[in-house]
Amino acid sequence: MKVARFQKIPNGENETMIPVLTSKKASELPVSEVASILQADLQNGLNKCEVSHRRAFHGWNEFDISEDEPLWKKYISQFKNPLIMLLLASAVISVLMHQFDDAVSITVAILIVVTVAFVQEYRSEKSLEELSKLVPPECHCVREGKLEHTLARDLVPGDTVCLSVGDRVPADLRLFEAVDLSIDESSLTGETTPCSKVTAPQPAATNGDLASRSNIAFMGTLVRCGKAKGVVIGTGENSEFGEVFKMMQAEEAPKTPLQKSMDLLGKQLSFYSFGIIGIIMLVGWLLGKDILEMFTISVSLAVAAIPEGLPIVVTVTLALGVMRMVKKRAIVKKLPIVETLGCCNVICSDKTGTLTKNEMTVTHIFTSDGLHAEVTGVGYNQFGEVIVDGDVVHGFYNPAVSRIVEAGCVCNDAVIRNNTLMGKPTEGALIALAMKMGLDGLQQDYIRKAEYPFSSEQKWMAVKCVHRTQQDRPEICFMKGAYEQVIKYCTTYQSKGQTLTLTQQQRDVYQQEKARMGSAGLRVLALASGPELGQLTFLGLVGIIDPPRTGVKEAVTTLIASGVSIKMITGDSQETAVAIASRLGLYSKTSQSVSGEEIDAMDVQQLSQIVPKVAVFYRASPRHKMKIIKSLQKNGSVVAMTGDGVNDAVALKAADIGVAMGQTGTDVCKEAADMILVDDDFQTIMSAIEEGKGIYNNIKNFVRFQLSTSIAALTLISLATLMNFPNPLNAMQILWINIIMDGPPAQSLGVEPVDKDVIRKPPRNWKDSILTKNLILKILVSSIIIVCGTLFVFWRELRDNVITPRDTTMTFTCFVFFDMFNALSSRSQTKSVFEIGLCSNRMFCYAVLGSIMGQLLVIYFPPLQKVFQTESLSILDLLFLLGLTSSVCIVAEIIKKVERSREKIQKHVSSTSSSFLEV
């Protein structure tokens, strides 16, 4: 086995040694020796020059995915379509029968059809590739003595990486610091129980397999508990995960329910189309028509009538919609979620950072002896003052206040550097408070001996320390957390410099003050200190404000009005939670609030009975989210659930739409989620729901257009054959219609701008088919108008009973113009084209103009006239056709107008009856 290797990279006059170290060897060596081999500075990290030199040799910390098959092969594969092969056979037969004009025409048409299909498929693949790049993994590493937030792909061997709960390990690391560290290695070893990690060297005899290397954190594994630091020993394919990656190239993504239904619809239409086409061939042959001509037309009709492009365009529309959502700060990781967004009727949202800004500022202090202090200033900086009875407090001037500040500063993992917070906002607020009093240096005065990390279950954090200058004295514990939890560990309280026994009367005083601060919308933290966790002295309370995000109240109002119920989940007290919810318009007189303890006391059945009326879940933890989701889903709700912590991952997977926070969310949480809010803003959820509804509407518009064209083409040829008319369209003309049907005009319907009124529509029932009765009726009406209009033109031109190029040109152009007007009316199912704006969808305008220009070339350009067997038409002919074909759009607009009028009448009757009942 390879142990270590070195490569010289020229660097001017000097040469840099680039090492590679295996995880087995690194686990056996002391940390100091590993650092020496890697030429790494564990505390200060590498400098930029060293990083660039090492990357020159090792490359980026990512995997090389084998190149896809070349484009020419993908293009050739399009010819494997059975219908295309039949057309090619038709062209070959034409050559053998010396019908060279037909052979050339069919070949040109085949090339155009194949090219359009290839471009569609390539575009679909590229759109999906873009989706996979939306969430690049990130990490924290130390470089040049500073902690940096960087992309995981930037790491090189020798980098120092910091890990915390919820992180995905970005490379193979030899750990040199570990506090209560537990890592889930199931993705690598298959072992579901998290592995405890240490820093001591492992004897060679005991580290044969990966699971036994307890001082190595492997790339791709997940930190479940604790925190650590490690030095990078392997990146990319030189990591242990690199070997696994070679065996687990990504499988093809499963299709979305909508794609599956479109596949099924396509197969059903194909079945019916082949049946009808078979009858057309048989009847044509019995009527004595040319068998080769009938065969070519039938195959061309199959190409046009069978909507093979339906699933591809659906995929492209979904993918392009997802890319539009990115601009609105929402990253959708899985295409099915785009469909689900339009069905969402319940949003369960965390309060902190989603409904509120997550910009914590301490505004009030209450000491254990009843002293009140007001705090000024905002942000993570030293600008502001602590004021007691009108006097500014600084340093240790007021011991009761300074002891609270000391506890909050020492029992803290946050760092504020250059007014930038690195850590949790709540802890940042406590550091900023210490900075205002000039006590932020207290963090460095203590040496930690033990740590009890915060968890959403226990709702407190504690550290055991000794003073740096008094290490011979007993250790002291500092604790901060929810008042109800911290007070359990307290036996005494401070009053005017004295330590007194904590009585029930004193507890009641603190409880009342906590309730008063909470009802003002403040997040309340309790602080304590003492020799042991069970013998702490209560120091007091701090009130932290977290203002609501701008625009959230308006978003909440809009969503509730559209039929989406919103429920707030928070770890705060009832008073704080209800105060914030009321301010946001979430909580009304008829609303209920339920605590985490009450959720524990109920089963899913009991909770499902009251959950529709509950607007606030307070003192709730991630484990309660699972029960809330199940109770809502039991009632038939489609639930979106937000989360940011490791323990939220299970709930996010169980929800119909799991929503992770982009800024505060852990890697585990982001991986479990279906959607990531880049800015952690609740408004972004509303924008995503709006976009989801809009995308679904666009797909309905596209389906309406394509199916009406398919049905019209089939019906036209069928009726002409059964009525013993000459064929109104030849094979090349039918294939041209197919290009329009599957090409740019159709695809441009998928990118129609979202109608702003769509957010006010109620959520869609997820059981509803995309082909509603109303949509089927509109498809049939459009098809009938197109068929009748085209047959009328054909009959009108055929009155001399002799079919000429002019006859087919008029019929062909009539069908194409009908198609363009049909596409125009399909842009919206409810609004007039003038309401949405003729030019609001530029891509549609370009597509229609391009199709019309193409049609004019087919009519007037001699080489194409020969291919499509057309002849020039007069201006009067074109004006006549434009007037006739506009009828499909006019009728569609009349239907929309009637539907809107009927809807207004129903609303008026409904409001009148409700007013009557109230009276």
UniProtKB/Swiss-Prot annotation:
It catalyses: Ca(2+)(in) + ATP + H2O = Ca(2+)(out) + ADP + phosphate + H(+); Mn(2+)(in) + ATP + H2O = Mn(2+)(out) + ADP + phosphate + H(+). Changing residue 350 to A: Impairs pump activity. Keywords: ATP-binding, Calcium, Calcium transport, Disease variant, Golgi apparatus, Ion transport, Magnesium, Membrane, Metal-binding, Nucleotide-binding, Translocase, Transmembrane, Transmembrane helix, Transport. Ca(2+) binds at residues 303-304, 306, 308, 738, 742. Found in most tissues except colon, thymus, spleen and leukocytes. Expressed in keratinocytes (at protein level). CDD domains: P-type_ATPase_SPCA (cd02085). One of its GO terms (cellular component) is Golgi cisterna membrane. GO terms for biological process: actin cytoskeleton organization; calcium ion transmembrane transport; calcium ion transport; calcium-dependent cell-cell adhesion via plasma membrane cell adhesion molecules; epidermis development; Golgi calcium ion homeostasis; Golgi calcium ion transport; intracellular calcium ion homeostasis. It is linked to Hailey-Hailey disease: An autosomal dominant cutaneous disorder characterized by erythema, skin blisters and erosions, and suprabasal acantholysis. Blisters and erosions most often affect the neck, armpits, skin folds, groin and genitals. ATP-driven pump that supplies the Golgi apparatus with Ca(2+) and Mn(2+) ions, both essential cofactors for processing and trafficking of newly synthesized proteins in the secretory pathway. Within a catalytic cycle, acquires Ca(2+) or Mn(2+) ions on the cytoplasmic side of the membrane and delivers them to the lumenal side. The transfer of ions across the membrane is coupled to ATP hydrolysis and is associated with a transient phosphorylation that shifts the pump conformation from inward-facing to outward-facing state. Monomer. Homodimer. NCBIfam families: ATPase-IIA2_Ca (TIGR01522), ATPase_P-type (TIGR01494). This is Calcium-transporting ATPase type 2C member 1.
